[in-house]
């Protein structure tokens, strides 16, 4: 597609050592980008860029399917998922597939089906990617105008945005349908230690749903990460799906207003930077969610949260010492505070010791022992159930600590047990990737703004050292 400006004026050109390493239409002369700059060569070749994106989707889905089958092949039903380094099966189990009361896996066949379906899908996507990258039309504008676009066409860009929003909304509603009609989802709060159940009484009150967004991110507030019942989670997906679909329809039907046309940079690289910024935010939120939230990420599958493991240890030793005759209500610890129980700054009865910092933890194995003023002494003396003892002992010994220095009082194992919690893996990976995406957002936003302002000239090539070197070939 011919454009009105020279590509060289807008994009800094990296000089190839060997100008012959290129395919027609994708070489440095016609695109202004060398081979290693990847999809930048395809900025104005919508057909080839489609191929790159479809092939990328194929790689993603292939990883999902292959890793899914790998986890199924290695899965041992007798051990908890979090002891086996699994990250995909816990997601499937949370959706209610293959599990029963207490999070026990009763059928691995749904996991196998999931892996195979993803592999088959990846083959279709892979074929489409190769077809559009190598055989399909270089540009879509002439043959398929609906799928064609010009990056500067603000109306077309917001139409594409609208289509994406509708697809995201449909995705949110798929979870709602699963929870309501197709077998339900796993609820860690179900009585007696968790079970799969259909969610019947959705929370649709905007005050509750949007109240999460208005909460402080700190302490006992915890912003949206503090959500602790499935009715709110599924109701939130109803709201989110509706907003995405309505917003998508809005963006398809309307053109950007004048203030939006002025405020944004309208180029391919600008859209890339916006997308990277959004993905970065997703990564940081996912990091906090998997680290702190034991409702959307049930501890039966992902292992306990850090605060949960710490509170579980305090509970385990309270149970032990109470059996040995300790009066847990009045015993003093080495600091003069309560050894087993103390009061929070606001007067609730909480666990004593170093775990006091986690006093606002909520967990399904602990909540039955709370009364109106925090932990209830009479319940701690008479009502502790065997499943609560078993679960807390299990969680105490599976803290997601890795090699953190501050362990919240958890007695760590010096003989290096080979255990890293999936919460540790998922939280750290999403934080690191979220950070990298943020850096990419800054990088591409800076380049896009410079190009729009007209002062992106690239490096002065006249004195480039490589020009005086012998060519590689």
From Swiss-Prot:
Mode of membrane association: Multi-pass membrane protein
Keyword Manganese: yes
TM ranges: 69-93, 134-155, 178-200, 255-275, 291-312, 447-471
Presence of the UniProt keyword Transit peptide in the record: no
Highest taxon listed in the record's lineage: Eukaryota
UniProt keyword annotations, A-Z: Acetylation, Chlorophyll, Chloroplast, Chromophore, Manganese, Membrane, Metal-binding, Phosphoprotein, Photosynthesis, Photosystem II, Plastid, Thylakoid, Transmembrane, Transmembrane helix
Gene Ontology CC annotation, any one: photosystem II
Alphabetized Gene3D superfamilies for the sequence: photosystem ii from thermosynechococcus elongatus
Record-level Gene Ontology MF annotations: chlorophyll binding; electron transporter, transferring electrons within the cyclic electron transport pathway of photosynthesis activity; metal ion binding
A biological process from GO: photosynthetic electron transport in photosystem II
InterPro entries found in the cross-reference section: PS_antenna-like, PS_II_antenna-like_sf, PSII_PsbC, PSII_PsbC_sf
Function: One of the components of the core complex of photosystem II (PSII). It binds chlorophyll and helps catalyze the primary light-induced photochemical processes of PSII. PSII is a light-driven water:plastoquinone oxidoreductase, using light energy to abstract electrons from H(2)O, generating O(2) and a proton gradient subsequently used for ATP formation.
Subunit structure: PSII is composed of 1 copy each of membrane proteins PsbA, PsbB, PsbC, PsbD, PsbE, PsbF, PsbH, PsbI, PsbJ, PsbK, PsbL, PsbM, PsbT, PsbX, PsbY, PsbZ, Psb30/Ycf12, at least 3 peripheral proteins of the oxygen-evolving complex and a large number of cofactors. It forms dimeric complexes.
Similarity annotation: Belongs to the PsbB/PsbC family. PsbC subfamily.
Protein's recorded name: Photosystem II CP43 reaction center protein
Organism: Calycanthus floridus var. glaucus (Eastern sweetshrub)
The gene coding this protein: psbC
């Amino acid at each position: 597609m011919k454009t009105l400006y020279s590509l060289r004026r807008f994009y800094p050109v990296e000089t190839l050592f060997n100008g012959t390493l290129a395919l027609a239409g994708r070489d440095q002369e016609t695109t202004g980008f060398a081979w290693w700059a990847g999809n930048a060569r395809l900025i104005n070749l919508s057909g080839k860029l489609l191929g790159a994106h479809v092939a990328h989707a194929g790689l993603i889905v292939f990883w999902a399917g292959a890793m899914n089958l790998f986890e199924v092949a290695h899965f041992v039903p007798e051990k908890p998922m979090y002891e086996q380094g699994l990250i995909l099966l816990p997601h499937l189990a949370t959706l209610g597939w293959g599990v029963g009361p207490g999070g026990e896996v009763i059928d691995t066949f749904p996991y196998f089906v999931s892996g195979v379906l993803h592999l088959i899908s990846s083959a279709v996507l892979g074929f489409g990617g190769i077809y559009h990258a190598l055989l399909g039309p270089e540009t879509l504008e002439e043959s398929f105008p609906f799928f064609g676009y010009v990056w500067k066409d603000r109306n077309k860009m917001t139409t594409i945005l609208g289509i994406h929003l509708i697809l995201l909304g449909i995705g949110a509603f798929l979870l709602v349908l699963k929870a309501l009609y197709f077998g339900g989802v796993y609820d860690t709060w179900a009585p007696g230690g968790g079970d799969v159940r259909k969610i019947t009484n959705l929370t649709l009150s905007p005050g509750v749903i949007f109240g999460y967004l208005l909460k402080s991110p700190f302490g006992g507030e915890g912003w949206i990460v503090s959500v602790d019942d499935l009715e709110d989670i599924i109701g939130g997906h109803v709201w989110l799906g509706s907003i995405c679909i309505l917003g998508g329809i809005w963006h398809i039907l309307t053109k950007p207003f004048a203030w939006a046309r002025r405020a944004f940079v309208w180029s391919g690289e600008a859209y890339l930077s916006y997308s990277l910024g959004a993905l970065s935010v997703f990564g940081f939120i996912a990091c906090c969610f998997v680290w702190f939230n034991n409702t959307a990420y049930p501890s039966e599958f992902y292992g306990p949260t850090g605060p949960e493991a710490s509170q579980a240890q305090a509970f385990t030793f309270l149970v032990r010492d109470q059996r040995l005759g300790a009066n847990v209500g009045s015993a003093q610890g080495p600091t003069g505070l309560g050894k087993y129980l103390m009061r929070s700054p606001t007067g609730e009865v909480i666990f004593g010791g170093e775990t006091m910092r986690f006093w606002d933890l909520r967990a399904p194995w602990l909540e039955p022992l709370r009364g109106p003023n925090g932990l209830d002494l009479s319940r701690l003396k008479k009502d502790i159930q065997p499943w609560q003892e078993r679960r807390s002992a299990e969680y105490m010994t599976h803290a997601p600590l890795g090699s953190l220095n501050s362990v919240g009082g958890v007695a760590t194992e010096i003989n290096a047990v080979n255990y890293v919690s999936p919460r540790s893996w998922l939280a750290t990976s999403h934080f690191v990737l979220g950070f990298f995406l943020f850096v990419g957002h800054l990088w591409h936003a800076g380049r896009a703004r410079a190009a729009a302002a007209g002062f992106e000239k690239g490096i002065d090539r006249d004195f480039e050292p490589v020009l005086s070197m012998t060519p590689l070939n």
